[in-house]
């Protein structure tokens, strides 16, 4: 709270439409109900659990704080179905599309 609240206030001062910090046990459902456009999670597991529940096949993981853009499909490698013809590439395609959209903005 001592770091997040001043960061949110600084973004508001720059004209950004932001809200928070929010309790993680409710914010993802609120986002799913279109109260927010995006949720920034402070921890990997805190963000992945609801993202996988709400959008396993179309969720995109965006890693912040790197010197390069990193997006990935929001599921594992599924070695158990590798080379069986069962894998669905759609979430990887969505991840690539998101990376291209971000680089254009």
Curated annotation (Swiss-Prot):
PANTHER family: 4-HYDROXYTHREONINE-4-PHOSPHATE DEHYDROGENASE (PTHR30004), D-THREONATE 4-PHOSPHATE DEHYDROGENASE (PTHR30004:SF6). Belongs to the PdxA family. GO terms for cellular component: cytoplasm. One of its GO terms (biological process) is pyridoxine biosynthetic process. Homodimer. Catalyzes the NAD(P)-dependent oxidation of 4-(phosphooxy)-L-threonine (HTP) into 2-amino-3-oxo-4-(phosphooxy)butyric acid which spontaneously decarboxylates to form 3-amino-2-oxopropyl phosphate (AHAP). It is an enzyme of class 1 (oxidoreductase). The active site is located at the dimer interface. SUPFAM superfamilies: Isocitrate/Isopropylmalate dehydrogenase-like (SSF53659). Its EC number is 1.1.1.262. Binds 1 divalent metal cation per subunit. Can use ions such as Zn(2+), Mg(2+) or Co(2+). The keyword tRNA processing does not apply. InterPro entries: PdxA_fam. Its main location: cytoplasm. The gene is pdxA. This is 4-hydroxythreonine-4-phosphate dehydrogenase. It catalyses: 4-(phosphooxy)-L-threonine + NAD(+) = 3-amino-2-oxopropyl phosphate + CO2 + NADH. Keywords: Cobalt, Cytoplasm, Magnesium, Metal-binding, NAD, NADP, Oxidoreductase, Pyridoxine biosynthesis, Zinc. A divalent metal cation binds at residue 44. It comes from the Bacteria.
């Amino acid at each position: 709270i001592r770091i997040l609240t001043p960061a949110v206030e600084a973004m508001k001062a720059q004209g950004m439409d932001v809200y928070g910090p929010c309790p993680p046990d409710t914010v993802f459902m609120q986002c799913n109900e279109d109260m927010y456009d995006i949720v920034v999670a402070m921890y990997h597991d805190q963000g992945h659990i609801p993202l996988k529940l709400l959008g396993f096949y179309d969720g995109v993981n965006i890693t912040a704080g790197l010197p390069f853009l990193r997006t990935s499909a929001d599921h594992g490698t599924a070695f158990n179905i590798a080379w069986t013809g069962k894998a669905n590439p759609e979430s990887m395609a969505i991840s690539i599309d998101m990376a291209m959209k971000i680089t254009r903005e």
